[in-house]
């Protein structure tokens, strides 16, 4: 996975 998507993954895990 590219670094640009890591924050999006964390957000999805929190929701």
From Swiss-Prot:
Hemagglutinating activity stable when incubated at 65 degrees Celsius for 30 minutes. Hemagglutinating activity is reduced by 50% when incubated at 75 degrees Celsius for 30 minutes and is abolished by incubation at 85 degrees Celsius for 30 minutes. Hemagglutinating activity is stable between pH 4.5 and 7.5, but is completely inhibited by incubation below pH 3.0 or above pH 10. GO terms for biological process: defense response to fungus; killing of cells of another organism. GO terms for molecular function: D-glucose binding; galactose binding. Lectin that binds strongly to galactose, lactose, D-raffinose, L-rhamnose and cellobiose, and less strongly to D-glucose, D-xylose and L-arabinose. Does not bind D-galacturonic acid, D-fructose, D-mannose, D-ribose, L-sorbose, maltose and sucrose. Has hemagglutinating activity towards human type O and rabbit erythrocytes. Has strong antifungal activity against B.cinera with an IC(50) value of 1.2 uM, and weaker antifungal activity against D.turcia, F.oxysporum and Colletorichum sp. Lacks antifungal activity against F.oxysporum and M.arachidicola. Glycosylated. Keywords: Antimicrobial, Fungicide, Glycoprotein, Hemagglutinin, Lectin, Plant defense. This is Antifungal lectin AMML. Homodimer.
């Amino acid at each position: 996975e590219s670094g640009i998507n890591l924050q999006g993954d964390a957000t999805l895990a929190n929701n």
